[in-house]
């Protein structure tokens, strides 16, 4: 039996050892006046391997009243599940700022941090009102094998209607990627490291992305 030991800082769960740092956004949306710089990235995560970003969100464009500022707040620029290209929060323009009009709540969150096993599990209600869906995500890490396993689940009472969703994983600009012929795996090269990302249930696509962070 593993203990539930939240390693939480400012709404983020952060688990790390000397080689790997795994962090997940597991915080509810703050009140309106504190959302000037808020990004709708609930359950998004980042992975740092040996001091180098492997999985990285797109970053944040700080200048107000700019399309890139609005875009960088969207869920599509975060490593998370997006339904029908809609963000998990709705923004409204107030003066020159985009503030959250409809926020979300984290419904549950838990983490396990053992020497040979890590886990983060959380869910949010950002798609409940419009799509009657709760997004739940679980990420496991096995330090001895350097292996991550992730699960995304949409919990819906009414399953009669199909919904379109995408799960995006943004990679650091320093990575090199190659897709296997069966469209089920991506080979990732990060300096002197090699990683393999696989998905058995869906095809994987590679596309160009936007990176607003500082390139290493």
Spell out what each predicted region is.
Residues 1, 60-216:
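CBM-like, beta-strand-rich accessory domains located in the C-terminal region of large
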């Amino acid at each position: 039996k593993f203990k539930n030991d939240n390693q939480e800082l400012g709404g983020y769960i952060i688990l790390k050892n000397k080689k790997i740092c795994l962090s997940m956004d597991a915080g509810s949306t703050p009140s309106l006046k504190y959302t000037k710089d808020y990004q709708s990235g609930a359950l998004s995560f980042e992975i740092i391997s040996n001091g180098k970003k492997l999985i990285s969100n797109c970053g944040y464009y700080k200048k107000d009243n700019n399309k890139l500022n609005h875009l960088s707040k969207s869920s599509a620029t975060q490593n998370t599940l997006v339904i029908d290209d809609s963000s998990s929060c709705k923004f409204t323009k107030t003066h020159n700022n985009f503030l959250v009009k409809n926020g979300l709540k984290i419904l549950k969150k838990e983490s396990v941090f053992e020497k040979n096993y890590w886990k983060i599990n959380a869910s949010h209600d950002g798609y409940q009102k419009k799509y009657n869906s709760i997004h739940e995500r679980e990420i496991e890490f096995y330090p001895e094998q350097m292996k991550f396993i992730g699960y995304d689940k949409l919990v819906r009472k009414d399953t009669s209607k199909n919904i379109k969703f995408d799960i995006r994983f943004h990679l650091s600009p320093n990575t090199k990627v190659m897709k296997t012929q069966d469209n089920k795996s991506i080979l990732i090269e990060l300096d002197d490291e090699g990683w393999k990302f696989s998905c058995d249930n869906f095809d994987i696509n590679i596309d160009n992305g936007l990176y607003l962070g500082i390139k290493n």
